[in-house]
Amino acid sequence: MLGSLSIVKKVNLHSIIQRHQFKMLLVSISVGIMSGLFIALVRLNLGMPGHKAFFWMTPVLIARLRGGCKIGTTAGGLFAALTTYSFGANLAGGVIGMPLIAVAGMILDWTVNHIEKNNISGWLLVLILGFAGIAANLVCLSKRMILPTGLDPHFILGVSGFWFRLCSYSFFGSLAGIIAAISVKLKINKQLYENN
């Protein structure tokens, strides 16, 4: 009799965890859709290569860090790309580049899963997510290289070329990771302060 009760408790705990993961997946997808709408409807025209990744990566990564869905960044990134494509914008370089948005999301999900598994916090969290953002956005740069149009030229302050593009993608990727990490770090610090 006692064995059957412990089995029921394990099943109930497992179903609760699954329900929570599903709810957080829906949150990540919703954040991805809102990010995609922002990118599609608000044309910033910054002219900086890789700047759109900042506007989808940061909110989706914050939702993943706060929500805990294991595939939240991947799902949010894909839905951001699908939303922008549906509204005529060009986040993922069209249908050809969408799988690489998923790869960028997988890099971020793997990194966050590693951070959660090893209880990494503090400034090391900020540093790791900054580098993960760089890696994810450089995957997006490789996406631009496989498109039929190739690397269209960008000229800002008389600077152009591959190295400028590489630095710009790295900057916006690291900025997204760092801002997401700091926002979560500030939230944790605020909760610790309120509990004491």
Where do the protein language model's features map onto the residues?
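Short helix-perturbing small/polar motifs within transmembrane alpha-helices
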Residues: 2-16, 24-31, 37, 98-142, ...
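Hydrophobic transmembrane alpha-helices
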Residues: 3-67, 71
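Juxtamembrane/transmembrane-helix boundary motifs in multi-pass membrane proteins
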Residues: 15, 19, 23, 48, ...
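Hydrophobic alpha-helical transmembrane segments
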Residues: 25-29, 58, 70-78, 95-99, ...
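Interfacial aromatic-anchored transmembrane helix boundaries in multi-pass membrane proteins
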Residues: 37-49, 80-110
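Alpha-helical transmembrane segments of integral membrane proteins, especially early/N-terminal helices
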Residues: 53-63, 93-95, 130-135
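Membrane-helix interface "capping/anchor" motifs
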Residues: 63-76, 115-120
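Membrane-embedded alpha-helical hairpins and interfacial helices in multi-pass inner-membrane proteins
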Residues: 118-196
